[in-house]
Structure formats: structure tokens, C-alpha cells
Amino acid sequence: MQIIRTIKELENFVQNASGKIGFVPTMGALHDGHVSLIKKCVSENETSIVSTFVNPTQFLPGEDLDKYPRKEQSDIQICEQNGVSAIFIPDANELYFEDEPLIVAPKKLSTILEGKTRPGHFDGVLRVLNKLFRLTRANSVYMGKKDTQQLIIVQNMIKTFFLNIELVACDIVREPDGLALSSRNVYICDEDKCNALRLSRSLNKALNLIQNGEEDASEIKANMLEVLEPLKVDYVAVTDRNLNEISKVEKGNTIILVAAYVGKTRLIDNIWI
């Protein structure tokens, strides 16, 4: 496996790569959720690239950029163990320039849910991914459904800029108790763990209601909020696959999303119905 830190090295690697190129963009601190993406990427492509870059442009002032977990040696080891062809570990100065043209996320998609709480976040996400997609010349990109809004906005960018990329949406990986895996889970102390489980339990409550015939979105959200007490809830939403709020669940075209604070840590989760 090659360890790549500069754009020049990456360009040389890609130029000499054989077959289809699969790409897994991450911010490092790799966990089993990332590993599931990596394994799928490696199994479906002759060449696989993983990036581990804590992207400063997607963090808002006062967010956790400085304390976001960084585990470079562990990330390298995980990629090696799973057969990755190359890991790209750039510095911010390698990717960003002064006065460069910016990509702005579509207003409708980027100002709801996560975007309402984190204005400008998705602009930063698209800014770095547009660069990484072009640098890696990826045929397929693997991203998780945990960041559903990001997934949908990235698909929109791929379509808008006519990028010849297949975006592969991969299922959420959970701990045995149901907690969705996230690099930010390291912030959760033991006494807060039970409260963190309220997110997945609220989604399970919604799923059980739907399986028993409930279709009314308001009723589903009310039941979820009961499970989420006493957390500080950012949002509970029932939407279609384009993130439009809906009043009635339609199986095969519904996403239920939740965001809440556990202590000072903000967690997100969702299920696709």
C-alpha cells in the first residue's frame, strides 16, 4: 500500500493505476463503519484509494475542528489490513489556495436539517469532495447512509457537474446495542451512553409503528420525541428520498432522521423505510 501526502504523488499513482478506481473519502479516525465501506470498495475495484483528511472548510466556528480525533497510524494500519491500494493523507495547504472559485451547495437541500444548524457546512463538504473526486479520478465513490443529507447533496453535485462517478450508498454500521458508529462517539462518556442509545431506539420505535400500520408522520414524530426525552433534540424529520418533509409514510420512499445532543456531543442517525 502506498502512503501519499501530496497532489503530485497522487497524480502519479492514479496515472499508473490499473482497472476501475474506487474511492472512500473520510476524515480519518477510522472505525468499523469505515471498514465496511473500505471492504466493499476493495472488493469491487482493481484500485482502491482512501483519504483521511480532517477538512477545515466544513467546520463552523466553535465546532470541534481542533479536537476532532486524529489517528494516522491506526488509519494506515486499518487500510493496510484491508487491502487498500493507497491512502491519501494531505495537509490543508496541499488542497486549498487563496481566492479559489467556490462551490455552493444547493440552497434548498443545504439549509434544512443539518444545514439549518450548521450553515455553510455542506459548501465545505462539496468544496473538498469536488477536488478529491477529480484528483483520484474515481469511477466509484463509497459513502455511508449515516450522513444521508450529505449523500443526497453529493449525488446532486455529481449530476450537476456531469461527473462520471457511481455513488455507492452503504448501510449504517451499528454497535451491538444499536448505536450508530461515528468518530465522534469517543466524546461520549460512560454515563451518557444510555442517553446516546435514545436516538437508535427512537428510530426503532418509528419502525415498529410503521410495521404495525402507522403512516401518519406527526404521530411517528411524537412517539420518537417521547423516547428522546430528556435529550436536547435538534430535529426529528420524516421525509421522502429527496428530503422533502412528508405527512404520510410511503414505504420504499421514506427517510426518518434525528439529531440530538448527548451532553455536549451532537449525534445524528436515520433509517430508510
From Swiss-Prot:
Active-site residues, record numbering mapped to chain: H34
EC code: 6.3.2.1
Binding site for beta-alanine: Q58
Catalyzed reactions per annotation: (R)-pantoate + beta-alanine + ATP = (R)-pantothenate + AMP + diphosphate + H(+)
Gene Ontology CC terms: cytosol
Other facts: The reaction proceeds by a bi uni uni bi ping pong mechanism.
Primary site of residence: cytoplasm
Organism of this sequence: Campylobacter concisus (strain 13826)
Protein name: Pantothenate synthetase
GO BP annotations listed: pantothenate biosynthetic process
Cytoplasm is among the record's keywords: yes
Family that this chain belongs to: Belongs to the pantothenate synthetase family.
Pathway entry: Cofactor biosynthesis; (R)-pantothenate biosynthesis; (R)-pantothenate from (R)-pantoate and beta-alanine: step 1/1
Taxonomy, superkingdom: Bacteria
Cell compartment(s), UniProt: Cytoplasm
Subunit-level organization: Homodimer.
Entries under InterPro entries matching the protein: Pantoate_ligase, Pantoate_ligase_C, Rossmann-like_a/b/a_fold
Keyword Nucleotide-binding in record: yes
Keywords of this entry: ATP-binding, Cytoplasm, Ligase, Nucleotide-binding, Pantothenate biosynthesis
Residues at which (R)-pantoate binds: Q58, Q150
Function (record text): Catalyzes the condensation of pantoate with beta-alanine in an ATP-dependent reaction via a pantoyl-adenylate intermediate.
Xref: SUPFAM superfamilies: Nucleotidylyl transferase
